Amino acid sequence: MREKGKLVIWPANLDKSRSRKGGRIISRKSSLEAPLLRELTAAAEKLNLNPEVEADKKYPRTWWESSGRILVDNNEAKTMVARKIAKTIKEARGG
């Protein structure tokens, strides 16, 4: 069970190839192609969100894939946090 005061961010939340119904929570323009758990973790650390990695977790809509998730501090809306993480990953990727 997750802690109170934490947001759950899945790689699927930032994945450009997914639909909104499939789990993406930010616009396609802001989203990423195939985000990795380690990228999410590094970006969250850079943003001082105190990420906790849960690599063995499976996204409910794709329960057959083990994508993992991160728990970050709940300082603002989940979509805002997701946009900041995606922007940081894009900068790290060089784009």
From Swiss-Prot:
<keyword id="KW-0963">Cytoplasm</keyword>
<keyword id="KW-0687">Ribonucleoprotein</keyword>
<dbReference type="GO" id="GO:0048500">
    <property type="term" value="C:signal recognition particle"/>
</dbReference>
<dbReference type="GO" id="GO:0006617">
    <property type="term" value="P:SRP-dependent cotranslational protein targeting to membrane, signal sequence recognition"/>
</dbReference>
<dbReference type="GO" id="GO:0008312">
    <property type="term" value="F:7S RNA binding"/>
</dbReference>
<dbReference type="Pfam" id="PF01922">
    <property type="entry name" value="SRP19"/>
</dbReference>
<protein>
    <recommendedName>
        <fullName>Signal recognition particle 19 kDa protein</fullName>
    </recommendedName>
</protein>
<dbReference type="InterPro" id="IPR002778">
    <property type="entry name" value="Signal_recog_particle_SRP19"/>
</dbReference>
<comment type="function">
    <text>Involved in targeting and insertion of nascent membrane proteins into the cytoplasmic membrane. Binds directly to 7S RNA and mediates binding of the 54 kDa subunit of the SRP.</text>
</comment>
<comment type="similarity">
    <text>Belongs to the SRP19 family.</text>
</comment>
<keyword id="KW-0694">RNA-binding</keyword>
<dbReference type="InterPro" id="IPR022938">
    <property type="entry name" value="SRP19_arc-type"/>
</dbReference>
<keyword id="KW-0733">Signal recognition particle</keyword>
<dbReference type="InterPro" id="IPR036521">
    <property type="entry name" value="SRP19-like_sf"/>
</dbReference>
<comment type="subunit">
    <text>Part of the signal recognition particle protein translocation system, which is composed of SRP and FtsY. Archaeal SRP consists of a 7S RNA molecule of 300 nucleotides and two protein subunits: SRP54 and SRP19.</text>
</comment>
